Amino acid sequence: MIDPFKRLARKGLFLFDPETAHGMSIAALKSGLVPACQLTPDPRLRQTVAGLTFENPLGMAAGYDKNAEVPEALLKLGFGFTEIGTVTPKPQSGNPRPRIFRLVEDEGVINRLGFNNEGHDAAFGRLAALRGGGMIGVNIGANKDSEDRIADYVAGIRRFYSVARYFTANISSPNTPGLRDLQGRESLAVLLSAVLAARDEMGAASGRKIPVFLKIAPDLTEEGMDDIAAEALSHALDGLIVSNTTLSRDGLKDQRQAKETGGLSGVPLFEKSTAVLARMRKRVGPDLPIIGVGGVSSAETALEKIRAGADLVQLYSCMVYEGPGLAGDVVRGLSKLLDREKAASIRELRDTRVDYWAARKV
């Protein structure tokens, strides 16, 4: 339940269009106006995933800090990790504005941003200047006008290898024409071979192997999920992120905004993304790391992702409605839920509802 102060702050921000409000929130984080979250570390939330140790399982999803402007400020809000990007080799302006739409009744967001970002060099410069050593992932993509999109992903691996703790290859945004075609089995095999070969080459030269995750769409057929699982396993991919935004508009109250093109995120994405997460967990088995994202708005929904098969979870859109204190609320809430469950580690609860979610019709 949103408290009166948060409600007032939200009302003020909502006087501005969503993209302007987003820019204001970045500026506030840069200036230090947003207070840091004081969390007591809970060893039950700490776990090692893909060879990396996370202090807690909650991350900020890609899309908020596209240009690596505030990664350390985000970590101070209580996130155990954050993911910058999506970044493309060359700067690009994205699609025409307006391109972000709030669905207030649904607590959802539709965006058709189109990978707007300042390019590799700008983001790299900011990350290289950091001294904190926080858990910061880099989400890489392809330029809209690229003649060789796979080469763009390889370029991302090479450019950010010295500053990334992990990589995410984003092939599932619905806002770059043809990008989701890379999820097809033949294209995916070529992409994974190229990206992982670049990672292995850079790893051999540097002495450190950086994990690579693949971010997939929720709008996959059963065959599509089969293909992605098979290629992920055969290429020894380090993990999956499930899922990106959806093109579906099922069950929305705000039918006026629902007509806008773009990807839907926030609360309306929770059930669909969680069902796809569980189906992918059943396909890839217990060992491949999965980050669950889509509609996480509370400790309860974060834990439900974990019960459905996620090792870690991410959020973004729900912070639009709940404010910057959401991360701390979720992490503290997870500790309370572990108390209730009498669990010694959050890992004990993973997969406990995977069958339920895999069977959900969405």
Curated annotation (Swiss-Prot):
UniProt-listed GO biological process terms: 'de novo' pyrimidine nucleobase biosynthetic process; 'de novo' UMP biosynthetic process
Pfam families found in the cross-reference section: DHO_dh (PF01180)
EC number: 1.3.5.2
Pathway stated in the Swiss-Prot or TrEMBL entry: Pyrimidine metabolism; UMP biosynthesis via de novo pathway; orotate from (S)-dihydroorotate (quinone route): step 1/1
Active-site residues per Swiss-Prot or TrEMBL entry: S173 (nucleophile)
Principal cellular location given in the protein's record: membrane
CDD domains: DHOD_2_like (cd04738)
Compartments (UniProt record): Cell membrane
Classification via Gene3D superfamilies: Aldolase class I
Cofactor note: Binds 1 FMN per subunit.
Keywords: Cell membrane, Flavoprotein, FMN, Membrane, Oxidoreductase, Pyrimidine biosynthesis
Positions that bind FMN: A62, G63, Y64, D65, K66, T86, N139, N170, K215, S243, G266, G295, Y316, S317
Topology of the protein relative to the lipid bilayer: Peripheral membrane protein
GO molecular function: dihydroorotate dehydrogenase (quinone) activity
PROSITE patterns: DHODEHASE_1, DHODEHASE_2
GO cellular component: cytoplasm; plasma membrane
Enzyme class: oxidoreductase
Cofactor list: FMN
Entry binding sites for substrate: K66, N111, R112, L113, G114, F115, N170, N175, N244, T245
HAMAP family xrefs: DHO_dh_type2
Entries under PANTHER family matching the protein: DIHYDROOROTATE DEHYDROGENASE (QUINONE), MITOCHONDRIAL (PTHR48109:SF4), DIHYDROOROTATE DEHYDROGENASE (QUINONE), MITOCHONDRIAL-RELATED (PTHR48109)
Family of the protein in this entry: Belongs to the dihydroorotate dehydrogenase family. Type 2 subfamily.
Function of the protein: Catalyzes the conversion of dihydroorotate to orotate with quinone as electron acceptor.
Subunit (UniProt): Monomer.
Protein's recorded name: Dihydroorotate dehydrogenase (quinone)
